[in-house]
Curated annotation (Swiss-Prot):
Protein origin, superkingdom: Bacteria
Protein name (record): Ribosome rescue factor SmrB
Molecular function in Gene Ontology: RNA endonuclease activity; rRNA binding
Segments forming domain Smr: 93-168
EC nos: 3.1.-.-
Family label: Belongs to the SmrB family.
Role of this protein: Acts as a ribosome collision sensor. Detects stalled/collided disomes (pairs of ribosomes where the leading ribosome is stalled and a second ribosome has collided with it) and endonucleolytically cleaves mRNA at the 5' boundary of the stalled ribosome. Stalled/collided disomes form a new interface (primarily via the 30S subunits) that binds SmrB. Cleaved mRNA becomes available for tmRNA ligation, leading to ribosomal subunit dissociation and rescue of stalled ribosomes.
Membrane-crossing segments per the record: none
Gene transcribed to yield this protein: smrB
Keyword Nuclease: yes
UniProt xrefs under Pfam families: Smr (PF01713)
Key words, A-Z: Endonuclease, Hydrolase, Nuclease, RNA-binding, rRNA-binding
Length: 176
């Protein structure tokens, strides 16, 4: 190709587009992407977990001896049954390595799963020592309306690193 061909091609192109004016672009607003069902369910679950569990609430719990709590109106025999290990937990939640916000969500999900599966007893492992979760989990459990009682787990279910939790399923016959 030489310069004459370039000039000739350019002239031909100019002749072809002569009289054409650019299209005026109107602004197009695209919808924000729709949230998936999982995102919506997770957000709803977080909202419910935050409404049940407050970090500032300080219930009266035992300082010495095994960690235990019994809701008003629940027979004290239930606490004794939990202590002896008469109830076998159907679901187990291990909170080792979780942050507080994640642990709250998992705890709320565990209680919801117990209700859904008609499981009266579950085990929550929070770990040994005097860590944050060991202090917070009993305080959160006291606040949930579906929790009837909890007691430090027997050795076979984690001992002082875990709690056996009794869930209120309504008027169902007791399962052991």
């Amino acid at each position: 190709m030489n310069k004459d061909d370039d000039k000739e091609g350019l002239a031909m192109f100019s002749a072809l587009i002569d009289g054409i004016k650019p299209i005026t672009q109107d602004k197009r607003h695209f919808r924000t992407p729709l949230k998936t069902k999982q995102e919506i369910a997770l957000k709803e679950q977080q909202l419910h977990a935050n409404s049940y569990f407050s970090d500032t609430y300080q219930p009266l719990l035992p300082i010495q001896g095994p960690m235990r709590w019994l809701d008003d109106g629940v027979d004290s025999l239930e606490l004794k049954r939990l202590r002896r290990g008469d109830y076998q937990p159907d679901l187990l939640l291990d909170l080792h390595g979780y942050r507080q916000s994640e642990a709250k969500l998992e705890l709320a999900a565990l209680i919801q799963a117990c209700v859904k599966q008609q499981s009266q007893c579950c085990c929550v492992m929070h770990g040994y020592g005097s860590g944050i979760l060991k202090q917070q989990v009993p305080m959160w459990l006291v606040q949930h309306p579906m929790v009837k009682a909890f007691h430090q787990a027997p050795k076979e279910w984690g001992g002082d690193a875990a709690l056996l939790v009794l869930i209120d399923l309504g008027e169902l016959p007791h399962r052991r």
